[in-house]
């Protein structure tokens, strides 16, 4: 049994906390929001983010970051990408040398063009940073539906340790040393999913969606390989797998936001309607900047930026 804290109590953090708890680990969930923590502790259910999914009595909840971080075997960082750097900075004083932090969010920082793991390493240099990614909607993981993901880490030892911690009968975990490729696939697919959703909102058919997914992964792979990612990463679970589920699923907030824009909503109206973080909106500008920096043609990413910021 490991002692684990999940930093961030959104839908994905809640689903992973439940998975880890079912695996027999001692799990604490942290949120900066006192009302959210009180509600979770009392109701044992996140009714706004993961309704109908009950949390065990053994799970603990806190707003005390020091208490959440210190003495834990590993930490799961599950805050929205725009809060990754700030949260990591606040965690830093309490993180022990070599303590494992698994980032499970997806995004690229617009100002620096850094991936999330790079931001965490920047703020917490003493940590052993890993990532978890793949086609995995929180709603399905919370319900115990079969899911397959990949853990990326710098060392095989860390990757295999996390594989053992997360793996269950319904949650299969592969390992990869290609953290950069995994993170690029996970963040850039959100931008392509906005395009796929917009096509749905405009009433276009399956032919259009198939084209967007296929040409979308080609764009992602071109950039990712130029930046140093491995080709097989983009044609595996954390590339095409994640892209398919995000472009096609009813659970996908990026697809839903795109769908609403296709129906005539503005970006702001669509984001308000979705009521959860739409990571693709925050990654779109960064994706365009990366394409220019590395001189890679990404026409879908270009058009998404035009729809979002010039429409």
Q: What does each model-found stretch correspond to?
A:
Residues 4, 27, 127-129, 173:
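Hydrophobic anchor at the start of a short beta-strand
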Residues 1-53, 60-63, 90:
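NAD(P)+-binding Rossmann beta1-loop-alpha1 motif at the extreme N-terminus of oxidoreductases
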Residues 55, 62-70, 74-146, 162:
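Rossmann-like NAD(P)(H) cofactor-binding subdomain of soluble oxidoreductases
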Residues 196-197, 225-235, 243-311:
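NAD(P)-dependent Rossmann-like dehydrogenase/reductase catalytic/cofactor-binding core
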Residues 70-71, 188, 240:
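Alpha-helix C-terminal capping/helix-to-coil transition sites in glycosyltransferase folds
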Residues 83, 94, 119, 123-127, ...:
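Internal alpha-helical scaffold of NAD(P)-dependent oxidoreductase catalytic cores
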């Amino acid at each position: 049994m490991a002692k684990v804290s999940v930093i961030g109590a959104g839908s994905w953090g809640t689903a992973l906390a439940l998975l880890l708890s079912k695996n027999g680990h001692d799990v604490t969930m942290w949120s900066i929001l006192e009302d959210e923590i009180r509600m979770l502790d009392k109701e044992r259910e996140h009714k706004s983010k993961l309704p109908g999914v009950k949390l065990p009595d053994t799970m603990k909840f806190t707003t005390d970051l020091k208490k959440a971080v210190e003495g834990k075997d590993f930490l799961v960082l599950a805050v929205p990408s725009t809060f990754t750097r700030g949260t990591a900075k606040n965690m830093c004083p309490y993180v022990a040398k070599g303590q494992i932090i698994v980032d499970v969010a997806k995004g690229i920082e617009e100002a620096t063009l850094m991936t999330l793991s790079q931001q965490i390493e920047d703020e917490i240099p003493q940590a052993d940073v890993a990532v978890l990614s793949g086609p995995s909607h929180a709603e399905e993981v919370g319900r115990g539906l079969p899911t397959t993901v990949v853990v990326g880490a710098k060392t095989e030892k860390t990757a295999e340790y996390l594989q053992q911690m997360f793996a269950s009968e319904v949650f299969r975990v592969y390992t990869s040393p290609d953290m950069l490729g995994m993170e690029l696939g996970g963040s850039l697919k959100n931008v392509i999913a906005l395009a796929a959703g917009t096509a749905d909102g405009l009433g276009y058919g399956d032919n259009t969606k198939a084209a967007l997914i296929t040409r979308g992964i080609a764009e992602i792979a071109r950039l990712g390989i130029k930046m140093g990612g491995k080709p097989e990463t983009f044609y595996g679970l954390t590339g095409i797998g994640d892209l398919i589920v995000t472009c096609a699923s009813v659970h996908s907030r990026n697809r839903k936001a795109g769908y609403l824009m296709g129906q005539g909503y503005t970006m702001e109206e669509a984001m308000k309607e979705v009521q959860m973080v739409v990571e693709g909106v925050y990654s779109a500008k960064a994706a365009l900047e990366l394409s220019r920096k590395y001189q890679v043609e990404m026409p879908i990413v270009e058009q998404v930026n035009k729809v979002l910021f010039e429409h």
